[in-house]
Amino acid sequence: MDTKEEKKEQKERKQSYFARLKKKKQAKQNAEIVSAASSKSRSGKDDANSDILEQDKFNVTAEGDHSTDDKKKRKSNQLKEIRRTELKRYYSVDDNQNKTHDKKEKKMMVQKPQGTMEYTAGSQDTLNSVALKFNVTPNKLVELNKLFTHTIVPGQVLFVPDANISSSTIQLSSSTPGATVSPSSSDAEYDKLPDADLARKALKPIERVLSSTSEEDEPGVVKFLKMNCRYFTDGKGVVGGVMIVTPNNIMFDPHKSDPLVIENGCEEYGLICPMEEVVSIALYSDISHMKIKDALPSDLPRDLCPLYRPGEWEDLASEKDINPFSKFKSINKEKRQQNGERTLALDAKSVRSPEESTERTCTRIEPPDNSELWKLKNLQSSRGTTSESPSVTQLSMRAALEPTAKENCLLKGDEDFVDLEELSSQPESGINKGDATKECLSYDQKKDGPHTVMSAKKGHVQSAQEVMGPESDTELKGALDLETAEKQDEAPEVDKHSGSPENLGESTLNIHEDLDKIKLIEFYLNKNKEGSQLLENVQKSELSDRKSIEPGGIDITLSSSLPQAGDSPPEDNKEPGTLWVKGGETLPLKLDPSAEETVINNKEVLDSLGSSLDKMCHSAQMDNKSEIQLWLLKRIQVPIEDILPSKEEKSKTPPMFLCIKVGKPMRKSFASHTATMVQQYSKRRKQPEYWFAVPRERVDHLYTFFVQWSPDVYGKDAKEQGFVVVEKEELNMIDNFFSEPTTKSWEIITVEEAKRRKSTCSYYEEEEEEEEGLPILQPHSALLENMHIEQLARRLPARVQGYPWRLAYSTLEHGTSLKTLYRKSASLDSPVLLVIKDMDNQIFGAYATHPFKFSDHYYGTGETFLYTFSPNFKVFKWSGENSYFINGDISSLELGGGGGRFGLWLDADLYHGRSNSCSTFNNDILSKKEDFIVQDLEVWTFE
């Protein structure tokens, strides 16, 4: 009975234990249900606090019987459970209601970058495949999506560039301050709430705000540069191509369309060079250093072009040197903006204010009644002489001209060339691009006098007059040089043979025939977008009578003029064939009646010109910061094709010159390996130096790239390294100068003196022969002759040369037994030479790095070789295929093996032998036959 009662008590205890476990489980479930219900009804801090309080109450009532230590442990567990339930509101996946609630509260979303769209990754997608699909690089996708790894999972949403939006508009969200970044995972966000106290205070998910100085705002490091350049070859012309510069290599690929590439092939011009072989890199503004690359330092001229370094680089403060590249970019950008504003601002001496410009009136140029020609009369100024008053028409044109379209203009250069540039700009004030044209008359003082150049483009001609004095003329040219140097437009150079006017006060205007200019006029007048032809007849003419102009130095230029709305001509004076120009006075332009064989003979052209200018006078608004566009043409004596702007876009500014000095010649990227080696050996004597013409716009990029990736290379000279490169020929010349005996006069000597001198000079030669003599053999060999010994001694390894040879074993003395050979070689500790003579009197053998001995495996090193004198002396060294050098057995001795064949095999009696071709030495058969009979055998050691 007692046992039954004890069993019942134990059973009750067990039930109470499981009951307690069940109660704990129910308590946890109830706590979760309460927290979920409270999260639906409440939000924010109240939810967290209510959940915590309810759970605390429930747990206290359920666990009241336990000790204080258990309460402390349970309390810590409760805090952990609280933290988990709190975070379940944000990371719950199964509960749809919680998910919708989370979407409302969760603000940790990545801002969508501009110009991108969302793409959901599939099961087969990788970052590389997605990048290839949208034509971007994987690194760009990582940067756009703020990824921490290149691994993506199916269903992941990525931002990819939108094909409908240009790539230039794509901006990263990190570039704007305050952009939020998504967490990498839920675990990362979970770690941001370490305990329940922070969970109570968490009103919303934690988000990371990027500051404007964050590292992610900085653009990625430039890993390579790609630019168009021209390569100056060594006597094979100048070739255009693409240069790619990386931190490890410099490559140049020529354009396939280049004439030299078409003629000679791309193998001659493709280059590649590792950055480790580059000795020096330098940028110059001219090629003066190219001409003196082989000159001695003492012969260098003093006016060499200095090494290029940005001006702002030296002005950087110490705090900016921490990251000089980004600071330099910002400084350079500010300078470019200032230069752009300076080009828009005109000189106060040559441009009037808007208040002063209101005094200007419209002046018409009216053709005579009896002719359709323009006639030139004396120019009269309302203010007196034009030399004393400012050039009113010039000022009006400067203020009135607007960058309305691409206009072709010839600008005077510094010395003896004319630049033909194509100025591109945006239309303003509702002016049509087709209304931009030019006509100009300019001087040719040194040749035949002034010539007329007229050009029209895209349907309309705008004409104006400009009166300039000598001073204003020079100011205008300076302003033009400044403006055109700042532009990035085409400027092919054209030769001319005329100089600047020297005595403008006494000059006269004469119109002469010029066939090239007439062709130019006809080309531009016929170049209409609608296909209409403005000028139909362009005839050759020469004006014999020359009208003199009132003194004052006048340069008449017909240019486009856009007057203000208030300066429009009177309504009653709108006549066909009348051209209105801006000016301070009436300037009638007429030609001499004797010149009736004309330059322009079409009244319809004049009517269209007048009507178009009349409309523009009403519609156009004048801008006081407009640029001036003039034609300063002296004389064109080149074909018309040479002065027309080319289709490909070129930089107007002159290029910079990149000089790359390398340790050895660059490799030809398109040539074969053999041709490349021949080319390198052929040019080894020359100083390897390569020159490239690079655009000036990319010079700062090149400089920054080289300073960043190879700071020790840029600007380093050979003399800074402690040595001067001297060609081999110069060294030979110096050596020969001191080695050759000095020239002496003829002298007669006796025979005894001649013999004495001969014996004295040959003393050292005999000593050298003794030094290079045969090694000492102890005793004399019965098989080897001096010829054999000499040839063998030359092929022995260096560690045994010079030692006397000692005979260790000979069949004549010790008998024919392999065991005896092993016994005699046991005391040796040096390489041995095996010499065999067969019954055919053929001598052959082997050199072994170790003495012959009994062994269970092959031994020896790669210095082991086989040799034969049958019929000529040959040595077969180790091929490297295997290491079967020497193997000593009781029944045989083997040297070389592989494939069941031995290079040299001897039996136990040293009587029979065999020689085959083996893979160890790739040797021939050493004897005349594969099987041979040994006549004599010797083993020599070196001591």
From Swiss-Prot:
Q: Protein name, please?
A: Nuclear receptor coactivator 7
Write down the superkingdom of origin: Eukaryota
PROSITE patterns linked: LYSM (PS51782), TLDC (PS51886)
Q: Which UniProt keywords apply?
A: Acetylation, Activator, Coiled coil, Nucleus, Phosphoprotein, Transcription, Transcription regulation
Q: Where is the composition biased (Polar residues)?
A: 177-187
Write out the biased-composition intervals (Basic and acidic residues). 1-15, 349-369, 486-499
Any single GO CC term annotated in Swiss-Prot or TrEMBL for this entry: nucleus
Record-stated family:
Belongs to the OXR1 family.
| UniProt-annotated location(s) | Nucleus
- For the modification N-acetylmethionine, the affected residues are M1
Chain positions covered by the region annotation Disordered: 1-83, 169-189, 334-369, 486-507, 543-576
Tissues with expression: Highly expressed in brain and kidney. Weakly expressed in mammary gland, lung and testis. In brain, expression is found in neurons of cerebral cortex, thalamus, hypothalamus, hippocampus, cerebellum, striatum and choroid plexus.
In the record, which positions carry Phosphoserine?
S92, S182, S186, S211, S212, S214, S442, S498, S500
Gene3D superfamilies, alphabetized: LysM domain (3.10.350.10)
Keyword set includes DNA damage: no
Write out the GO biological process terms: negative regulation of cellular response to oxidative stress; positive regulation of transcription by RNA polymerase II
Give the molecular function GO annotations.
nuclear receptor binding; transcription coactivator activity
Q: Where in this chain does the record put each TLDc domain? A: 782-943
Task: Give all Phosphothreonine modified positions.
Answer: T137
- Check the record and name the Pfam families matching this protein: LysM (PF01476), TLD (PF07534)
Q: Among its keywords, does the record have Transcription?
A: yes
Subunit and interaction comment: Interacts with ESR1, ESR2A, ESR2B, THRB, PPARG and RARA in a ligand-inducible manner. Interacts with the heterodimer AHR-ARNT.
Q: Which InterPro entries match?
A: LysM_dom (IPR018392), LysM_dom_sf (IPR036779), TLDc_dom (IPR006571)
